[in-house]
Amino acid sequence: HVASVMDRLLSQAEERFGIRRQEIAPQTVFVSHETYTPARGGSAAAEIASLRQSFGEAANRVVIANTKGFTGHSMGVGIEDVVAVKALEHGIVPPIANYDDDFEPDPDLGDLNLSRGGQYPVQYALRLGAGFGSQIAMTLTRQIAGVGERIDRTVHNRWVADVAGYD
């Protein structure tokens, strides 16, 4: 179940990096995998339960983003990975599609923090990817402040030439 995967990931991150889930919740964007298919069960119920189980009361402080309302269901989850990384890079989280003043969210969402789009103080991105046959992958990515150029172009070009077999 998604909840056990999320809880295990966060527990490992807490142990390895000394973070605390309740403390990082206000700085976390959860990029949902929800397919907007509640009539077929969707994944919303599992994701809601996972956030609440893993973060407790702090779940309402995690900002939730989703791309499928804009892109449909792609054959891979790469779009969502890019959204997560770009949200960390720029501090801008895309809105939930059609989430405006007339939007009536599912009552099961309660007080969960659905993104209206814009600036959010995100430092962590929690990403769920799921596939047919109960394949589940989840990542927790942390923003690392840039300190100028990360790649030495001369070294990179030399490596590319070496790999490609050119002088």
Describe every region a protein language model picked out.
Residues 48-80:
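Conserved catalytic cysteine-centered active-site region
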Residues 74-167:
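Conserved beta-strand-centric core segments of catalytic alpha/beta enzyme folds
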Residues 7-10, 48, 52, 82-85:
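Generic hydrophobic alpha-helical scaffold/packing signal
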Residues 26-33, 100-105:
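A glycine-rich phosphate-binding loop feature that marks nucleotide/adenosyl-phosphate handling sites
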Residues 5-29, 54-61:
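Phosphate/pyrophosphate-binding loops at sites that engage ATP/ADP/AMP, CoA/4′-phosphopantetheine
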Residues 1-19, 36-46, 71-76:
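Active-site pocket-shaping loop/turn-to-helix segments
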Residues 28-33, 64-68, 127:
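Extended hydrophobic secondary-structure segments that form protein cores and membrane-embedded regions
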Residues 44-55, 143-148:
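A glycine- and small-aliphatic-rich helix-loop capping segment at beta-alpha/alpha-beta transitions
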